[in-house]
């Protein structure tokens, strides 16, 4: 058995030189991610697909990594056979997959893709195999529109590929095939999804964060940033730039009229991000703005916001509805994290005008002391996103006891997602384990026995630490972290 990686269709239509360039970058990205996760595999490059050969026990884990790498359209977990005839194909299917059991009492269809020279067509193979299966397996029927079971095959010359399972990938382009960008991220639904969309298009997306709410704001936003990096772009080193905007906010609220604050604040952010982008030779910015979503995002106001920068500003969500954005956030996994991030910009600018003018904005900004803005940018700090847990989250969270050796009275709360719990179950001898995904923990923790000590468990300890922080803020002290000894 092996994994076949099908390239994004947009890669396959490139010229030969560009196609080879993109594939080489994709292979490098795959190898980097496998190495980071202490996995090894052989990658064989073909013209229109890649083959991954690895230990049989690692297939599921490696597939889970590959489906989140930009540039991969889908994965096929396949068995490969040589064949001589259609009867040979039929026997290979029945012998290798026990379809007598899988198809019994169900509707099915056969789908075949074929390339090479043969004396039969793809449709003839489908028809032949369908007939043979119906003749030899009782109580089954063909359904070409909504089958309960679909048998996928690919034929290349005299090779037969039986597709055991198909996994959908991200599509798009491999990271590194496009230029670097700087995302103005607030941690909310919009900026997180906008960042993901440009990552998917092959951009190395760095993050610029304007801290409006202190340490807790930083921690909440860093959860989102680290999640995006860890899931979709850990093949690259990504910068996190944090700018303390508290003094800028004070200056704006003291000097700018209420109805102009929204646009002026956004202009100050774009100015600051442009200075940061110049420092790191980044040519484009990303925002999560949506046309007409709030008063500062009307066409006339966006034009005024753009005018303070020479950089291209990408707004991939410009025509999206909020419902569609949240659906995409849910799909990529940022929805739950973004829910906990307050919208500080909206709190600061509640009465923004929907249509201001250049003259009015410039008149208001004449009252603003730009040394405050320049000082904020000059005092910004930069770290590698992969160091966020150690350099930001752990430093801003009070010390919490971490246990490696458990007592028989301890109760472990497995706070991983249900999918993670199923893929890699936690087994502990004589220890009570409760499965409560982190997104349900806040609501369910108050229902637990307050006289017991609970230890939170996740794969890397990051989510456990964050959840302990939230629980302590709500007054719960009977909670610690469980990190099993390596």
Curated annotation (Swiss-Prot):
In this UniProt entry, which cysteines form S-S bonds? 345-458
Q: Describe the location of the THUMP domain by residue ranges.
A: 60-166
Q: Which UniProt keywords apply?
A: ATP-binding, Cytoplasm, Disulfide bond, Nucleotide-binding, Redox-active center, RNA-binding, Thiamine biosynthesis, Transferase, tRNA-binding
Protein name listed in UniProt = tRNA sulfurtransferase
Q: What is its main location?
A: cytoplasm
Boundaries of every Rhodanese domain copy: 406-484
NCBIfam families in alphabetical order? ThiI_C_thiazole, tRNA uracil 4-sulfurtransferase ThiI
What Gene Ontology terms for biological process does this UniProt record contain? thiamine biosynthetic process; thiamine diphosphate biosynthetic process; thiazole biosynthetic process; tRNA 4-thiouridine biosynthesis
Q: Which Gene3D superfamilies match?
A: 3.30.2130.30, HUPs (3.40.50.620), Rhodanese-like domain (3.40.250.10)
The UniProt entry's sequence similarity note says: Belongs to the ThiI family.
Which residues participate in ATP binding? 184-185, 266, 288, 297
Stored SUPFAM superfamilies:
Adenine nucleotide alpha hydrolases-like, Rhodanese/Cell cycle control phosphatase, THUMP domain-like
Catalyses: [ThiI sulfur-carrier protein]-S-sulfanyl-L-cysteine + a uridine in tRNA + 2 reduced [2Fe-2S]-[ferredoxin] + ATP + H(+) = [ThiI sulfur-carrier protein]-L-cysteine + a 4-thiouridine in tRNA + 2 oxidized [2Fe-2S]-[ferredoxin] + AMP + diphosphate; [ThiS sulfur-carrier protein]-C-terminal Gly-Gly-AMP + S-sulfanyl-L-cysteinyl-[cysteine desulfurase] + AH2 = [ThiS sulfur-carrier protein]-C-terminal-Gly-aminoethanethioate + L-cysteinyl-[cysteine desulfurase] + A + AMP + 2 H(+)
Any idea which residues are catalytic in this one?
Answer: 458 (cysteine persulfide intermediate)
Biological role stated in the UniProt entry = Catalyzes the ATP-dependent transfer of a sulfur to tRNA to produce 4-thiouridine in position 8 of tRNAs, which functions as a near-UV photosensor. Also catalyzes the transfer of sulfur to the sulfur carrier protein ThiS, forming ThiS-thiocarboxylate. This is a step in the synthesis of thiazole, in the thiamine biosynthesis pathway. The sulfur is donated as persulfide by IscS.
Q: Name one Pfam family in it.
A: THUMP
Q: Report the transmembrane regions from the record.
A: none
Please give an example of a GO cellular component term from this record: cytosol
Pathway(s) per entry: Cofactor biosynthesis; thiamine diphosphate biosynthesis
Give the originating organism. Answer: Blochmanniella pennsylvanica (strain BPEN)
Instruction: State the compartments where it is located.
Output: Cytoplasm
């Amino acid at each position: 058995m092996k994994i076949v990686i099908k390239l994004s269709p947009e890669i396959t239509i490139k010229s030969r030189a560009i196609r080879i360039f993109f594939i080489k970058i994709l292979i490098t990205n795959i190898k980097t991610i496998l190495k980071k996760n202490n996995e090894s595999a052989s990658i064989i490059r073909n013209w229109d697909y890649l083959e991954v050969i690895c230990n049989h026990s690692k297939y599921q884990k490696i597939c889970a990594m590959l489906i989140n790498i930009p540039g991969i359209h889908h994965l096929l977990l396949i068995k490969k056979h040589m064949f001589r005839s259609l009867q040979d194909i039929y026997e290979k299917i029945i012998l290798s997959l026990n379809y007598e059991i899988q198809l019994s009492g169900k509707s099915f269809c056969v789908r075949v893709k074929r390339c090479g020279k043969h004396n039969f067509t793809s449709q003839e193979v489908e028809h032949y195999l369908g007939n043979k299966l119906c003749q030899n397996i009782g109580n089954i029927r063909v359904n070409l529109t909504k089958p309960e079971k679909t048998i996928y095959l690919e034929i290349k010359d005299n090779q037969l590929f039986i597709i055991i399972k198909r996994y959908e990938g991200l599509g798009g382009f491999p990271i590194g095939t496009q230029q670097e960008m700087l995302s103005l991220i607030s941690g909310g639904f919009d900026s997180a999804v906008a960042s993901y969309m440009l990552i998917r298009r092959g951009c190395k997306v760095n993050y610029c964060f304007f801290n409006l709410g202190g340490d807790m704001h930083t921690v909440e936003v860093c959860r989102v940033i680290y999640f995006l990096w860890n899931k979709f772009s850990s093949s690259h080193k990504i910068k996190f730039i944090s700018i303390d905007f508290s003094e800028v906010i004070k200056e704006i609220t003291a000097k700018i009229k209420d109805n102009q604050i929204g646009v002026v604040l956004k202009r100050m952010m774009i100015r600051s991000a442009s200075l940061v982008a110049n420092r790191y030779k980044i040519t484009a910015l990303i925002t999560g703005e949506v046309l007409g979503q709030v008063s500062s995002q009307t066409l006339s106001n966006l034009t005024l916001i753009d005018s303070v920068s020479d950089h291209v500003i990408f707004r991939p969500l410009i025509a999206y509805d909020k419902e569609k954005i949240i659906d995409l956030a849910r799909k990529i996994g940022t929805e739950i994290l973004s829910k906990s991030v307050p919208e500080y910009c909206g709190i600061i600018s509640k009465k923004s005008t929907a249509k201001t003018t250049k003259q009015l904005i410039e008149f208001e900004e004449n009252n603003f002391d730009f040394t405050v803005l320049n000082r904020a940018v000059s005092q910004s700090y930069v770290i590698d996103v992969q160091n966020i847990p150690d350099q930001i989250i752990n430093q801003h969270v009070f010390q919490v006891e971490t246990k490696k050796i458990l007592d028989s009275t301890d109760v472990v709360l497995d706070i991983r997602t249900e999918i993670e719990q199923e893929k890699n179950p936690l087994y502990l001898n004589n220890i009570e384990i409760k499965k409560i995904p982190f997104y349900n923990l806040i609501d369910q923790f108050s229902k637990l026995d307050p006289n017991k000590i609970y230890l939170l468990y996740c794969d890397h300890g990051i989510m456990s630490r964050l959840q302990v922080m939230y629980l302590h803020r709500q007054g719960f002290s009977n909670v610690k972290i469980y990190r099993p000894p390596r």
